[in-house]
């Protein structure tokens, strides 16, 4: 796993040159937006259980056969495994967002995930749909476009650094799309 700093050093070392120019400008931008990045990761991790449970619920509402006898979310242990997998995927996406690099997501989460799901008989289309729902929820939390809806007292609006988070929303969205692409 390489963070933005390590990537710049490795790149400069490969060119046998000091870190400078566009690499240095990229690092300045990374540091300047660091608090926004931390707030984005905090928004995901603070709401992780809600994001995952809502995604699994949405997936099941769209395919009720998953909770019937023989379905992949029946009995309880399979449902628990589904929730656990969603939390693991979300955790690695938050790691990638914090580092500003997808290598940790690719190496430790996505490598062999589709093959594992196929071997276990997990419907990859449903898993991909759950990740798409997680993407919608997580990016709403990052971009602060989440609304109380039916959440009532459970709704939390995070205190975050002011400024445009569109780039972080897009980056997080790209990580979710990477997961969807890997399991579809």
UniProtKB/Swiss-Prot annotation:
(2R,3E)-phycoerythrobilin 2 binds at residue 82. GO terms for cellular component: phycobilisome; plasma membrane-derived thylakoid membrane. (2R,3E)-phycoerythrobilin 3 binds at residue 165. The modification N4-methylasparagine is found at residue 72. InterPro entries: Globin-like_sf, Phycobilisome_asu/bsu, Phycobilisome_asu/bsu_sf. It is a peripheral membrane protein. GO terms for biological process: photosynthesis. Heterodimer of an alpha and a beta chain. Light-harvesting photosynthetic bile pigment-protein from the phycobiliprotein complex. This is C-phycoerythrin class 1 subunit beta. The gene is cpeB.
């Amino acid at each position: 796993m390489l963070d933005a700093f390590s990537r710049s050093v490795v790149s400069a070392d490969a060119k046998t040159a000091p870190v400078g120019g566009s690499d240095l400008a990229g690092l300045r931008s990374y540091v300047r937006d660091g608090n926004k990045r931390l707030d984005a990761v905090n928004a995901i991790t603070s709401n992780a259980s809600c994001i995952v449970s809502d995604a699994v619920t949405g997936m099941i509402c769209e395919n009720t056969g998953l909770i019937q006898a023989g379905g992949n979310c029946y009995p309880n242990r399979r449902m628990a495994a589904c929730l656990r997998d969603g939390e693991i995927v979300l955790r690695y996406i938050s790691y990638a967002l914090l580092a500003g690099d997808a290598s940790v997501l690719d190496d430790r989460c996505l490598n062999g995930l589709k093959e594992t799901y196929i071997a276990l008989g997990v419907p990859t289309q449903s898993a991909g749909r759950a990740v798409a729902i997680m993407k919608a929820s997580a990016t709403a939390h990052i971009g602060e476009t989440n609304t109380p809806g039916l959440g009532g007292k459970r709704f939390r609006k995070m205190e975050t650094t002011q400024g445009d988070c569109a780039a972080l929303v897009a980056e997080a969205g790209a990580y979710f799309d990477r997961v969807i692409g890997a399991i579809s």
